[in-house]
Amino acid sequence: MLTDGSYFHLHLVSDSTGETLITVSRAVTAQYANVTPVEHVYPLVRSQKQLDRVLQEIEEAPGIVLFTLLETELVNRLEAKCQEINSPSLSIIGPVMQLFEAYLGASTMGRVGAQHTLNAEYFQRIDALNYSMMHDDGQHVEGLEEADVVLVGVSRTSKTPTSIYLANRGIRTANVPLVAGIPIPHQLETLKKPLVVSLHASPERLIQVRQNRLLSLGAGSGNDSYIDRQAVTDEVLLARKLSAKYGWSLLDVTRRSIEETAAAIMKLLADRQRQRVPE
């Protein structure tokens, strides 16, 4: 058993980019704050010769071995070596593929790196990212009608990171700040195609986030209205009034992570699209 402050070797073996392994392993290791994984990433392992080098490194630094390999011979050799040196190993996609095969009654194509094929979905994500970056923070409002989603909200309601997250899912997302004393762009008043979502947070949460932002910028508390409780409360109320006036969807992000906010927006978008499908 590892003690606090110790480390362990984590070997990630993939016949593709290794991104899947990295994402999964880091999600798990984040739950163990007191031990440190030493990552060894081996991408594009597709031959016996390439695997030989990997096995040598695993033998020199035994630890947990996670892999995404489709070639049966490579899998068998890797698992045999791990068993020989008493290193636990696990196929990340194997159990998932078995579940799919059992349910669908069909075997896989066994295409290495198939999840990274440059298909229509990939180019859709690139297009969405380009659009979202061009339409961040109220820029190019004349193109808002081309969005799938338009996010509005007062300062520090996570509009930009949520936009980028959604864009990574292929959703064209623009965001427009709601600023006290400044009229909203008239384009927001007449949108037909996009889903407009108004992001809200409690005044307490906004003040906390804004104070941290000012400190990170070394700005101190000189901008009193930015963190003044009454001023912030007025901002929140104004945003709610605008949302009610224009029929925007309301989403409270006070206790939501970016991922949770994006998931809620994607559900709103899916529900809206279902309602528009003629029966």
UniProtKB/Swiss-Prot annotation:
Bifunctional serine/threonine kinase and phosphorylase involved in the regulation of the pyruvate, phosphate dikinase (PPDK) by catalyzing its phosphorylation/dephosphorylation. Pfam families: Kinase-PPPase. Keywords: Kinase, Nucleotide-binding, Serine/threonine-protein kinase, Transferase. One of its GO terms (molecular function) is ADP binding. This is Putative pyruvate, phosphate dikinase regulatory protein. Its EC number is 2.7.11.32, 2.7.4.27. It catalyses: N(tele)-phospho-L-histidyl/L-threonyl-[pyruvate, phosphate dikinase] + ADP = N(tele)-phospho-L-histidyl/O-phospho-L-threonyl-[pyruvate, phosphate dikinase] + AMP + H(+); N(tele)-phospho-L-histidyl/O-phospho-L-threonyl-[pyruvate, phosphate dikinase] + phosphate + H(+) = N(tele)-phospho-L-histidyl/L-threonyl-[pyruvate, phosphate dikinase] + diphosphate. InterPro entries: Kinase-pyrophosphorylase, PPDK_reg. ADP binds at G153, V154, S155, R156, T157, S158, K159, T160. Belongs to the pyruvate, phosphate/water dikinase regulatory protein family. PDRP subfamily.
